[in-house]
Amino acid sequence: MLSPKRTKFRKQHRGRMKGIASKGNTIAFGQFALQAQDCGWVTARQIEASRRAMTRYVKRGGKIWIRIFPDKPVTMRPAETRMGSGKGNPEFWVAVVKPGRILFEMGGEEITEEIAKEAMRLAQYKLPVKTKFISSDINLSSDSSGEGKTGKDSKEEVKK
């Protein structure tokens, strides 16, 4: 599971999740992505479960990029202990997710939109935040109206 190798401080405050994601909110690596619609904490276990679900469905077809990393420690006190006597020990790691954040990306030559959509659907069942499937609008086909010719070339053809 994902966790930082080392941190400056062992424990953190819980914090607040205000506003929308300012970083990591555009597709950078693949053609298809899973984008968060609301805020929440995504644990390292949930990220791993989502990754496994997508990998199993896609098999060896394409590549999956994980765009979030659990870098926030969540502390817990042992059961049936009295109040006070300090903060609990770190139990697990979470990634703070805000609306608009890209969680996973997928791409590759064998990956169609249907395959990516189904794989992302399986992954979104494992996550505690509401998400939506998005795709980048990169169209690699040539322009059908001019077949890639400039205006000058097409004018010359008309004269002949």
UniProtKB/Swiss-Prot annotation:
Assembly information from the UniProt record: Part of the 50S ribosomal subunit.
Protein's recorded name: Large ribosomal subunit protein uL16
Annotated disulfide bonds: none
PROSITE patterns (alphabetical): RIBOSOMAL_L16_1 (PS00586), RIBOSOMAL_L16_2 (PS00701)
One of the record's GO cellular component terms: ribosome
Compositional bias segments (type: Basic and acidic residues): 149-160
InterPro entries: Ribosomal_uL16, Ribosomal_uL16_bact-type, Ribosomal_uL16_CS, Ribosomal_uL16_dom, Ribosomal_uL16_sf
GO molecular function: rRNA binding; structural constituent of ribosome; tRNA binding
Pfam families, per the entry: Ribosomal_L16
Function: Binds 23S rRNA and is also seen to make contacts with the A and possibly P site tRNAs.
This protein's UniProt keywords: Ribonucleoprotein, Ribosomal protein, RNA-binding, rRNA-binding, tRNA-binding
Spans annotated as Disordered: 138-160
GO biological process: translation
Keyword match DNA damage: no
Record-stated family: Belongs to the universal ribosomal protein uL16 family.
Organism: Prochlorococcus marinus subsp. pastoris (strain CCMP1986 / NIES-2087 / MED4)
